[in-house]
């Protein structure tokens, strides 16, 4: 079947069930096809019929509608139609229709058909002229109609805003600007970058072969940064080479990104100890929220001015024979994330119950009504205004029940999903990994997904890839390795959303050990109250974790590995598990006994005693998932009692 993208495709306007539809005229289709969303009297056939379409493929059809009324230019036509989901069209006029109402004549801008005689509606039999519509015209009309709808909706929204919504809009306008050093930026703090050895000169020779494109882009970009006061010409003895990168994100933006190699400077300077918040701790904070807003600090780092003594350290070289230094905190310094996170944490101090920042991304979250959420958002905006923090208006997303944040999509029903761009990056890697660096990047991307809890038993699948990263092992890549990478990528294409538990949900963890790997999953038992039925409990998957036992741990007995798997899983989710009782499910009756009976503190069992003491801090109710009737459970319980 031809697609709507074919500029020569023929469409005519028809009316079915009083709804006007752009129907595709397909001389290669055996019979008329309709999308299931068109409400016809569908009848399931005893056996499917096979139809051929224009691309020569054959498909099975199970539902058919007889005597479908199709109105064209106020003339009634009738034809049998079958239901097909994958046609890509609302309605396709096939050969059964064209043969029934022949002669069928097709011109450049029209088609002609013979309308049938219908005495019931006084319709004569006659040839009718039907103008055709091309896909480009359909698209033009659709865009125009959509634009009109959007403009009307914006007009209605603007005139129907509540006083609170208007206040939020006006305050957002006041704190937004495209220039991070606008007069709105009233921050007077000056950032210091200090050398470990103040006498050291950090000067990296620039031996990069620049292209003519590089020279032109550096000239334009640096001139713009000088004009904005972001950089200035320098006579510093320090220098780092600048270059352009064009990775996946840059290709999507259609703009290359300037990068400065501050590797030598980072080795020579004192770091910053302020830590970035962990993603899991962020998710713990926002659990149970049903309204979200995100704000973005405009060119975040650039809102912090450098101390005059620190500016020369940031000097960089680029063509054509230029030497600049930064007036603001540049990207690429090892101290930059910690410095900026500290800046944001101080500015938003006291708002932690409904607001958090991850570097330059701000998330406002509430479990409340929309109005209450907007009230909290207004507090955050007014704080930004007070502190002179400039935001990006085009990146502000206000009062949503589903929102993207840090590579995740947060939903008000408690589910979280990976954003598509994260999986796109993984898909870009070839199956046949070329070298160690590419393998490191692949595993790093995979770890990002695994750390969010989306991958089940991923350690078992990647355990043979990690040794290849080590330079002590000769590089070798086999067809089996390529097959494994392909399998992992396929697995990542179909990741189920995870549930983020509410405070009132009861938590369950399930653990297992197998050979040299361990795995666990976290579930939440959610109590539902469906209308007209009894209350029911539904277990929802929250996240997975897994790992590889160390070489020493791999020598442990099966029972010890099962116990250690439970401990490692509880350590991983300690923050979620410690506050209240939860259930630990295991298929090891040994672990059940381990949790119930105290060990004797003797030198033969020192490791197990330490594990049991650690176990005691968790309010776990251990459940043997194979049931109490398992004879091994009784045997092992007696074994524990004798110790």
From Swiss-Prot:
InterPro entries: DNA/RNA_pol_sf (IPR043502), Pept_A3A (IPR000588), Peptidase_aspartic_dom_sf (IPR021109), Rev_trsase/Diguanyl_cyclase (IPR043128), RNaseH_sf (IPR036397), RT_dom (IPR000477), RT_RNaseH (IPR041373), Viral_Replic_Matur_Polypro (IPR051320). Residues 6-209 form the Peptidase A3A domain. It comes from the Viruses. The active site is at 26 (for protease activity). GO terms for biological process: proteolysis. Keywords: Aspartyl protease, Endonuclease, Hydrolase, Magnesium, Metal-binding, Multifunctional enzyme, Nuclease, Nucleotidyltransferase, Protease, RNA-binding, RNA-directed DNA polymerase, Transferase. Residues 226-410 form the Reverse transcriptase domain. It catalyses: DNA(n) + a 2'-deoxyribonucleoside 5'-triphosphate = DNA(n+1) + diphosphate. Mg(2+) binds at residues 296, 360-361. Its EC number is 3.4.23.-, 2.7.7.49. Coiled coil: none annotated. GO terms for molecular function: aspartic-type endopeptidase activity; endonuclease activity; metal ion binding; RNA binding; RNA-directed DNA polymerase activity. It holds the Pfam family Peptidase_A3. Encodes for at least two polypeptides: protease (PR) and reverse transcriptase (RT). The protease processes the polyprotein in cis. Reverse transcriptase is multifunctional enzyme that converts the viral RNA genome into dsDNA in viral cytoplasmic capsids. This enzyme displays a DNA polymerase activity that can copy either DNA or RNA templates, and a ribonuclease H (RNase H) activity that cleaves the RNA strand of RNA-DNA heteroduplexes in a partially processive 3'- to 5'-endonucleasic mode. Belongs to the caulimoviridae enzymatic polyprotein family. The polymerase/reverse transcriptase (RT) and ribonuclease H (RH) domains are structured in five subdomains: finger, palm, thumb, connection and RNase H. Within the palm subdomain, the 'primer grip' region is thought to be involved in the positioning of the primer terminus for accommodating the incoming nucleotide. The RH domain stabilizes the association of RT with primer-template. This is Enzymatic polyprotein. It comes from Cestrum yellow leaf curling virus (CmYLCV). The lineage of its organism: Viruses, Riboviria, Pararnavirae, Artverviricota, Revtraviricetes.
């Amino acid at each position: 079947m031809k697609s709507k993208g074919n500029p020569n495709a023929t469409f005519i306007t028809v009316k079915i069930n009083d709804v006007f539809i752009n129907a595709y005229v397909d001389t290669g289709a055996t019979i008329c096809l309709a999308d299931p969303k068109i409400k016809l009297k569908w009848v399931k056939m005893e056996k499917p019929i096979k139809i051929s379409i224009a691309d020569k493929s054959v498909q099975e059809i199970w539902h058919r509608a007889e005597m479908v009324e199709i109105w064209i230019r106020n003339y009634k036509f009738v034809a049998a139609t079958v239901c097909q989901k994958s046609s890509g069209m609302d309605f396709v006029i096939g050969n059964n229709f064209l043969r029934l109402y022949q002669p069928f004549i097709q011109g450049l801008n029209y088609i002609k058909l013979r309308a049938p005689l219908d005495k019931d509606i006084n319709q004569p039999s006659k040839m009718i002229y039907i103008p055709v519509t091309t896909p480009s015209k359909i698209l033009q009309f659709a865009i125009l109609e959509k634009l009109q709808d959007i403009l009307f909706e914006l007009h209605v929204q603007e005139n129907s805003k509540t006083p609170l919504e208007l206040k939020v809009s006006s305050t957002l306008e006041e704190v937004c600007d495209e220039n991070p050093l606008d007069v709105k930026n009233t921050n007077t703090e000056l950032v210091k970058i200090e050398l470990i050895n103040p006498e050291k000169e950090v000067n990296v020779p620039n031996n990069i072969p620049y292209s003519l494109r590089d020279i032109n882009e550096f000239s334009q970009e640096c001139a713009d940064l000088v004009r904005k006061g972001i950089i200035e010409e320098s006579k510093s003895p320090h220098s780092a080479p600048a270059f352009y990168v064009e990775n996946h994100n840059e290709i999507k933006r259609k703009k290359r990104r300037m990068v400065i190699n501050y590797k030598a400077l980072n080795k020579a300077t004192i770091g910053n100890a302020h830590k970035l918040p962990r993603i899991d701790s962020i998710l713990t904070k926002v659990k149970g929220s049903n309204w979200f807003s995100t704000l973005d600090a405009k060119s975040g780092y650039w809102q912090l001015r450098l101390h005059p003594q620190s500016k020369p350290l940031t000097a960089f070289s680029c063509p054509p024979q230029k030497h600049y230094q930064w007036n603001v905190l540049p990207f690429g310094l090892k101290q930059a994330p910690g410095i900026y996170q500290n800046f944001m944490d101080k500015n938003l101090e006291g708002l932690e119950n409904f607001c958090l920042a991850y570097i330059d991304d701000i998330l406002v979250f509430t479990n409340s009504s929309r109005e209450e959420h907007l009230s909290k958002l207004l507090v955050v905006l007014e704080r930004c205004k007070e502190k002179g923090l400039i935001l990006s208006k085009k990146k502000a997303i206000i009062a949503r029940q589903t929102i993207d944040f840090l590579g995740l999509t947060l939903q008000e029903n408690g589910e979280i999903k990976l954003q598509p761009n994260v999986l796109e990056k993984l898909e870009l890697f070839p199956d046949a990994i070329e070298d160690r660096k590419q393998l490191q990047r692949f595993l790093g991307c995979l770890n990002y997904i695994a750390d969010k809890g989306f991958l089940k038993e991923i350690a078992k699948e990647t355990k043979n890839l990690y040794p290849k990263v080590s330079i002590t092992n000769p590089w070798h890549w086999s067809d089996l390795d390529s097959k494994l990478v392909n399998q992992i990528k396929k697995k990542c294409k179909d990741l189920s959303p995870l549930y983020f538990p509410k405070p009132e949900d009861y938590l369950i963890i399930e653990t297992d050990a197998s050979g040299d790997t361990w795995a666990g999953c976290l579930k939440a038992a959610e109590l539902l109250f469906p209308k007209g039925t009894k209350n029911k409990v539904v277990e929802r998957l929250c996240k997975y974790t897994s790992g590889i036992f160390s070489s020493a741990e791999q020598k442990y007995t099966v029972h010890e590995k099962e116990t250690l798997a439970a401990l490692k899983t509880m350590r991983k989710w300690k923050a979620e598990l410690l506050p209240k009782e939860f259930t630990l499910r295991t298929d090891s009756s040994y672990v059940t006994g381990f949790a119930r009976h105290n060990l004797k503190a003797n030198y033969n069992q020192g490791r197990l005693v330490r594990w049991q003491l650690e176990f005691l801090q968790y309010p776990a109710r251990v459940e043997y998932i194979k049931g109490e009737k398992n004879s091994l459970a009784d045997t092992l319980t007696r074994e524990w009692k004798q110790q």
